[in-house]
């Protein structure tokens, strides 16, 4: 099986559902659960989106929960590789923001740095990406 399928199935084993966009089940080009990478034996080097990263508690020391009714965020978003290569600052730099809502979904925000483990992300590289996720799915 190609690496994209393997990573996608690992995502299911972690409890994740598909990552869609605009009503299309497989459409998120920033996440292995969106099936938008290369379907070759070489695969595509990219990661999971902000909602999945939050649910897995990856880089949890750099997660920030925001209640938009009572606070804001004043900091810098950095890519996941800043943690891995040790260039992240002790304070003021974060990997994932969760913006809690009173509705059925929350928003997750991440800087989709196109480098290292995410150097072949199919779209939105080096951009801030916002993912909307139903709360009850767990990621």
Where do the protein language model's features map onto the residues?
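Contiguous ligand/interfacial binding patches
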Residues: 136-139
